[in-house]
């Protein structure tokens, strides 16, 4: 009996309808098709290619499989099925029958009957009803047989019924317990839903009267009021009227002065007016309104966030998208099809434009071309893609007739047509250029600031030469209006600058001392190389400081994650109350508006004076105050003197006119900071241990990568890899040999030695630094001040950097 039951259970699923019939059948099948019958499509050649080397008239096909059967090649293409083929594909699933039961084993007569009824149904559609009745008979017989088999076992249905009654009783008891009548009628309603009905707290009214002279729409002024900007900045009050009047503008203002809204407000105002006109005339959208280029990805993301925040208060807002590296190209192409304002970096923008003619066609009709941090974008030897973008936007669209003329025609006719085409292209180009406003903004347009501080050149460019340089790089439709918000000073007004003189090998020590003297101020540390960022970040982390890296070698998601953590001041509460620290290269030097950055430290002297201006501009933004400190070694003394002379050039002229010497200039621009040598000496042991640990970890990581690379190279060349022979051959006594030897020693450090170093550093960090206070006698101490600084690093009174006075 057990065997029969097993057979019955195994055959039960076979009698039911198959699951695959519930899935919709495909309406297309692939069949062999001749080459001429395929749906070929013409390949669009990018307009940027002046010479396609004869590859004209190319066609492509998709969705075709190539099958090779011996020497015969077949093209299998998708062909729609006919209605008859779709009907024959299988019977439609009509649901499960209530009385359907599995077939009993060995019932051959019933199987014959069902097969006969199926054959009759297939051959004679008129007998469908009869066939269905014949199909029901074996089902009834199956049911009777099943009941007969179950008659000896009468206890089974009784047990099932009793079990069901018990479950019903349990459910009823459970419902009685859960349904409790509320004693208070007010509790019957959900009070949390009423919170949505409560009126929002009224915000304080802001006086926006100073925005009225700029001739902005009421909805724009209302949107600005929601951002809590009561009055425009100097660059905004000067640049917005000129842009609204339709002029090309070159705007110069110090860092943190609101340059983004200076060009963002007119661009959005133009889109709003154009959208209303299209709505009234029932016209379709022709393309994007503005293209905004920025040198870095982080700045592009920030511009997008600022403009989106401005558009939140508008009833209808433009669609703003960012096109930058590190993100999916296909998604960006889809966004460009509907984008009204495009914010991009030159590299990714050129990649998309050069591969898709539709993107280039939509951007040719833009009303605004904006260059933020234009001096960086237009710098010689940088961002060649930006120049290609300008040329592509100025080039008139290529027509099909012109392409046909390129492929055929006599020489004389070709020359005449080329002359006519060149004249027409010049006229079209002039008309095309005149439609677009060009806006460029930056904090530094002086070419003198772009020169390397370590060089020997003494070239000094005048303001007229700077303007000529910009006019040569860009095709303005008119002489641009030059708006200078700070003609005298390059730096922000509320910025305090300091200079710390130290040894070349003591920069790590003085960096740590500076951060410890300002523990509650969020700091941004700038270096000149990616390797320095990779070395300093673990060094500061070993010293229990929340440090985050940012450099060009990181993927885009890691960059954004570091910036978000720094903005959120993540880890400050866990790491002895110290504020967050961002260690970055010049990637973070331009445009980034990170709130509450109080301290900027230049670990290396910048390569150019403009880099110092933009680095220091990350603090003291708007009306806030900030501090910029430069760590200078003996080898960097000459570049530092040149830096001071170039950055404070206007102050030098004023000092010369008043009879002062240049030495007073240094004291007025950069104040020398003297840190207590006793504090530095007591911090030295901590820094040395942290440096050894960081160098050992980095050497082990880099050593493993180098070995893997050498092994792979040896395998590719078919050479045996012997690390000892390579080490002997690679030994030399020249420049860099001592550094290589130190890396090797750090790489050979064992885990036990590394653990002992960590334990020693942990012990030092758990103690507070005594600054000359007697721990035995408290008579000479201010106990209240001591209790206030209980969680501080120093035991006793410590003077700060001395820049606040």
Curated annotation (Swiss-Prot):
This is ATP-dependent RNA helicase mak-5. CDD domains: DEADc_DDX24 (cd17946), SF2_C_DEAD (cd18787). It holds the Pfam family Helicase_C. The keyword ATP-binding applies. It comes from the Eukaryota. Residues 510-666 form the Helicase C-terminal domain. Residues 1-33, 79-189, 390-435, 729-751 are annotated as: Disordered. The Q motif is unique to and characteristic of the DEAD box family of RNA helicases and controls ATP binding and hydrolysis. It catalyses: ATP + H2O = ADP + phosphate + H(+). Keywords: ATP-binding, Helicase, Hydrolase, Nucleotide-binding, Nucleus, Ribosome biogenesis, RNA-binding, rRNA processing. Its EC number is 3.6.4.13. It is an enzyme of class 3 (hydrolase). GO terms for biological process: rRNA processing. A motif (Q motif) lies at residues 209-237. Residues 110-119, 126-143, 164-189, 390-406 have a biased composition (Basic and acidic residues). It is found in: Nucleus, Nucleolus. Gene3D superfamilies: P-loop containing nucleotide triphosphate hydrolases. Belongs to the DEAD box helicase family. DDX24/MAK5 subfamily. A motif (DEAD box) lies at residues 372-375. ATP binds at residues 253-260.
């Amino acid at each position: 009996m057990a065997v029969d039951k097993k057979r019955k259970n195994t055959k039960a699923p076979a009698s039911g309808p198959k699951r695959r019939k519930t899935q919709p059948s495909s309406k297309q099948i692939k069949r062999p098709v001749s080459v001429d019958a395929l749906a070929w499509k013409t390949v669009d050649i990018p307009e940027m290619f002046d010479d396609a080397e004869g590859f004209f008239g190319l066609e492509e096909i998709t969705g075709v499989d190539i099958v090779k059967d011996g020497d015969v090649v077949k093209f299998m293409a998708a062909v729609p099925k006919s209605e008859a083929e779709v009907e024959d594909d299988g019977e439609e699933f009509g649901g499960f029958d209530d009385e359907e039961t599995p077939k009993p084993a060995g019932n051959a007569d019933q199987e014959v009957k069902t097969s006969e009824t199926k054959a009759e149904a297939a051959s004679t559609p008129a007998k469908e009803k009869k066939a269905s009745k014949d199909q029901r008979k074996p089902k009834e017989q199956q049911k009777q047989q099943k009941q007969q088999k179950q008659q000896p076992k009468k206890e089974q249905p009784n047990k099932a019924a009793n079990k069901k009654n018990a479950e019903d009783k349990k459910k009823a008891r459970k419902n009685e317990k859960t349904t409790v009548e509320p004693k208070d009628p007010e509790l019957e309603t959900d009070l949390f839903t009423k919170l949505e009905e409560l009126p929002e707290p009224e915000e304080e009214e802001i006086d926006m009267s100073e925005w009225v002279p700029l001739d902005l729409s009421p909805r724009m002024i209302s949107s600005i009021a929601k951002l809590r900007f009561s009055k425009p900045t100097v660059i905004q009050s000067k640049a917005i009227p000129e842009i609204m009047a339709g002029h090309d503008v070159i705007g110069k203002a110090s860092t943190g002065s609101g340059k983004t809204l200076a060009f963002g407000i007119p661009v959005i105002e133009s889109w709003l007016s154009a959208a209303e006109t299209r709505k009234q005339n029932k016209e379709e959208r022709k393309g994007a309104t503005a293209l905004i280029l920025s040198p870095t990805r982080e700045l592009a993301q920030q511009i997008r966030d600022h403009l989106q925040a401005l558009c939140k208060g508008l009833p209808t807002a433009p669609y703003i998208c960012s096109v930058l590296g590190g993100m999916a190209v296909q998604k960006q192409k889809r966004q460009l099809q509907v984008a009204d304002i495009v914010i991009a970096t030159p590299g990714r923008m050129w990649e998309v434009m050069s591969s898709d003619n539709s993107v280039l066609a939509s951007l040719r009709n833009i009303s605004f071309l904006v260059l933020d941090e234009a001096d960086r974008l237009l710098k010689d030897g940088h961002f060649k893609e930006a120049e290609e973008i300008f040329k592509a936007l100025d080039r008139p669209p290529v027509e099909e007739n012109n392409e046909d003329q390129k492929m055929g025609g006599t020489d004389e006719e070709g020359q005449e047509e080329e002359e006519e085409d060149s004249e027409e292209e010049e006229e079209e180009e002039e008309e095309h250029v005149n439609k677009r406003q060009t806006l460029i903004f930056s904090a530094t347009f002086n070419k003198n600031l772009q020169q390397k501080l370590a060089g020997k050149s003494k070239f000094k460019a005048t303001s007229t030469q700077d303007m000529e340089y910009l006019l040569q790089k860009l095709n303005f439709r008119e002489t641009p209006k030059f708006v200078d918000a700070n003609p005298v000073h390059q730096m922000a007004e509320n910025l305090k600058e300091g200079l710390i003189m130290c040894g070349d090998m003591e920069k790590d020590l003085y960096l740590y001392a500076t951060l410890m003297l300002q523990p509650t101020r969020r700091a941004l540390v700038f270096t000149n190389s990616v390797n320095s960022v990779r070395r300093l970040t673990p060094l500061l982390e070993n010293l229990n400081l929340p440090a985050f890296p940012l450099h060009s070698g990181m993927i885009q998601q890691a960059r954004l994650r570091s910036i978000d953590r720094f903005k959120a001041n993540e880890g400050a509460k866990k790491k002895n109350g110290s504020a967050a620290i961002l260690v970055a290269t010049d990637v973070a030097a331009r445009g980034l508006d990170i709130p509450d950055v109080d301290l900027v430290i230049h670990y290396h002297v910048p390569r150019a004076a403009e880099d110092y201006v933009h680095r220091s501009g990350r603090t003291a933004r708007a009306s806030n105050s900030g501090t910029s400190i430069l760590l200078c070694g003996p080898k960097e003394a000459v570049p530092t003197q040149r830096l001071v002379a170039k950055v404070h050039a206007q102050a030098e002229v004023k000092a010369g006119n008043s009879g002062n010497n240049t030495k007073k200039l240094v004291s007025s621009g950069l104040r020398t900071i003297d840190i207590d040598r006793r504090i530095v000496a007591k911090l030295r042991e901590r820094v040395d241990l942290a440096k050894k640990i960081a160098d050992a970890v980095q050497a082990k990581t880099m050593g493993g990568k180098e070995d893997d690379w050498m092994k792979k190279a040896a395998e590719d060349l078919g050479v045996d890899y012997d690390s000892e022979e390579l080490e002997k051959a690679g030994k030399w006594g020249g420049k860099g040999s001592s550094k290589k030897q130190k890396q090797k020693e750090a790489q050979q450090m064992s885990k036990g030695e590394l653990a002992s170093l960590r334990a020693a550093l942990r012990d030092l960090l758990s103690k507070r630094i005594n600054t000359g206070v007697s721990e035995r006698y408290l008579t000479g101490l201010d106990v209240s001040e001591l209790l206030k600084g209980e969680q501080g690093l120093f035991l006793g009174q410590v003077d700060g950097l001395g820049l606040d006075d």
